[in-house]
């Protein structure tokens, strides 16, 4: 059966158009061309045209048109440069070192301390030999103020801590970071201050703007009736061994008497150690101080050799004790005890005779005792004989 031939006059449906017909529908300057089209070139502005367009004043007809245009985009701000890391915090250095020299002044200002021992239970003790106070953390440390005459009205007493060693004197003494964060403030003292005053509402805590040093100031009060001195109770709020704080560096407390204008009237100082067992530490340091303070032989001026001791003998000569020439009679019960005491006495007599300490009168007596000893020992002596065997010659 033959298939019916298609009529050429009948157009195929749209989906059946050929590729050539679709290609003819594309524009001549298509996007696949490797060269930019002329229309795109017309839209591009040269740098000269752009500068001229920006410098020309808009005409009356173009002004409304430009106002209707959208505002230009604001330039994107440049990314901020990262800030340099902050330097590590360091201890502030003071521009001056307070003097620690004792100055009694015209008012005879001096310090006093209560007498206390070296027991383990003591919380604060003072060593006169070392001029040093040993105390526990945040415990009461009474300091007595003595004067010969009353200072002028408005006088003040200032307490300041400095490091004792010269290589640390310029550093400001302050608490360690751990104790600064502790909630032990009384509402008056800044957390970084080491020294506080106990039981005085008129206390002032000062931070010097020039030297950055911390100090605590209280008004001077004359002694009460029946008392010869004024007592101030101080507290030390950080241990001497705290890392980040004093760090085992010795400190001095300087107490100054000032007038209302800040002029110095008197000065005194003492060393302080804040520790867990003040009595034990004081006893140890005093023993070491006494060992170091033993008298040594001084060298003559201009001599480079070590001075020899006056006594050149290698060993000290024993002191001769006078012997007692009296004789005593001792009654002893029992033969065994008598023999034991007699042998002990003979041994002592023999020792004295060998050392040459026995007087001449007692030597005859000792020889008589030796003869008696020989007789007594022969009584109990057993003679040993060699047994002759068959092989002996």
UniProtKB/Swiss-Prot annotation:
Residues 1-44 are annotated as: Transcription activation (acidic). Residues 319-360 are annotated as: Interaction with HIPK2. The modification N6,N6-dimethyllysine is found at residues 370, 373, 382. InterPro entries: p53-like_TF_DNA-bd_sf, p53/RUNT-type_TF_DNA-bd_sf, p53_DNA-bd, p53_TAD2, p53_tetramer_sf, p53_tetrameristn, p53_transactivation_domain, p53_tumour_suppressor. The modification N6-lactoyllysine is found at residues 120, 139. Residues 368-387 are annotated as: Basic (repression of DNA-binding). Residues 359-363 are annotated as: Interaction with USP7. Residues 72-90 have a biased composition (Pro residues). Its main location: cytoplasm. Residues 283-295 have a biased composition (Basic and acidic residues). Residues 116-292 are annotated as: Interaction with AXIN1. GO terms for biological process: B cell lineage commitment; bone marrow development; cardiac muscle cell apoptotic process; cardiac septum morphogenesis; cellular response to actinomycin D; cellular response to gamma radiation; cellular response to glucose starvation; cellular response to UV-C. There is a cross-link at residue 386 (Glycyl lysine isopeptide (Lys-Gly) (interchain with G-Cter in SUMO)). GO terms for molecular function: ATP-dependent DNA/DNA annealing activity; copper ion binding; core promoter sequence-specific DNA binding; disordered domain specific binding; DNA binding; DNA-binding transcription activator activity, RNA polymerase II-specific; DNA-binding transcription factor activity, RNA polymerase II-specific; DNA-binding transcription repressor activity, RNA polymerase II-specific. Residues 325-356 are annotated as: Oligomerization. The record marks 120 as: Interaction with DNA. A motif (Bipartite nuclear localization signal) lies at residues 305-321. The modification N6-acetyllysine is found at residues 120, 305, 321, 373, 381-382. One of its GO terms (cellular component) is nuclear matrix. The keyword Translocase does not apply. Gene3D superfamilies: 2.60.40.720, 6.10.50.20, p53-like tetramerisation domain. Multifunctional transcription factor that induces cell cycle arrest, DNA repair or apoptosis upon binding to its target DNA sequence. Acts as a tumor suppressor in many tumor types; induces growth arrest or apoptosis depending on the physiological circumstances and cell type. Negatively regulates cell division by controlling expression of a set of genes required for this process. One of the activated genes is an inhibitor of cyclin-dependent kinases. Apoptosis induction seems to be mediated either by stimulation of BAX and FAS antigen expression, or by repression of Bcl-2 expression. PANTHER family: CELLULAR TUMOR ANTIGEN P53. This is Cellular tumor antigen p53. The lineage of its organism: Eukaryota, Metazoa, Chordata, Craniata, Vertebrata.
